[in-house]
Each structure stands twice: as structure tokens, then as C-alpha cells.
Regions:
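Long, charge-rich, low-complexity alpha-helical segments
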Residues: 2-9, 36, 40-104
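A short glycine-rich, His/Asp/Glu-containing loop-to-beta-strand
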Residues: 26-32
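Hydrophobic packing positions characteristic
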Residues: 1-26
């Protein structure tokens, strides 16, 4: 289900239309869709607030490096650490088919 190309800070990524994001009791939950809400055999995926900010930014308009830079500016964190966290999260999301490269 994963992409052949490695996840990179230079690439732009987009959310899959096969997942619906909903805020439930303070958490963002990604719900798999297929023929209706929650029909796929895959579990829902919960994101913390930072992960939710990454998810919202994955619209193909900014590279992952730009997303990480915006998060570092917004949260005052160390850019290198945020880049590692963004890469780790997006690698998981790509592996589960929740996002894909904007050029795919």
C-alpha cells in the first residue's frame, strides 16, 4: 500500500480522499471510508494536536520542509526535531495509504 519513493522534506503531500478527519473529544480521528463511513477493515487513527496540524497542512501546497518550518515558527520548537517528527508521521500515513505524494 506504500509509495515506492521515500518520504522527503522536499516533496508535497496530499490527504487521501479515503479518510475523513473528525474532532472527537479533543482529538483528531482519521476514519477510513469505503462505500460509507467506517466500512473499511482498517482501524481509525488518532492524531495529537501537532499531528492534526500536519494533517491539515497536507493539501499539496507546501513541501514537508515548509510544513515543518511553519510548525517550528508556530510552536517555537527546534526545527530539526520537528522535521524528524513530521517525517516519521508522514511516513506512517503514507504506509497506511492515508496520504500520498502530490505528484503521484
Amino acid at each position: 500500500m506504500g509509495e515506492e519513493r521515500a518520504v522527503s522534506l522536499d516533496r508535497r503531500y496530499v490527504r487521501s480522499a479515503d479518510y475523513l478527519a473528525r474532532d472527537i473529544q479533543g482529538q483528531t480521528v482519521l476514519i477510513p471510508l469505503s462505500g460509507g463511513i467506517g466500512v473499511r477493515d482498517e482501524p481509525a487513527y488518532s492524531l495529537n494536536p501537532t499531528g492534526a496540524a500536519v494533517w491539515r497542512a497536507l493539501d499539496g501546497g507546501a513541501s514537508l520542509g515548509e510544513v515543518a518550518g511553519a510548525l517550528a515558527a508556530a510552536y517555537g520548537g527546534e526545527r530539526a526535531a520537528i522535521e524528524r517528527d513530521v517525517l516519521a508521521l508522514v511516513t506512517q500515513l503514507v504506509a497506511h495509504g492515508m496520504v500520498h505524494g502530490a505528484d503521484a
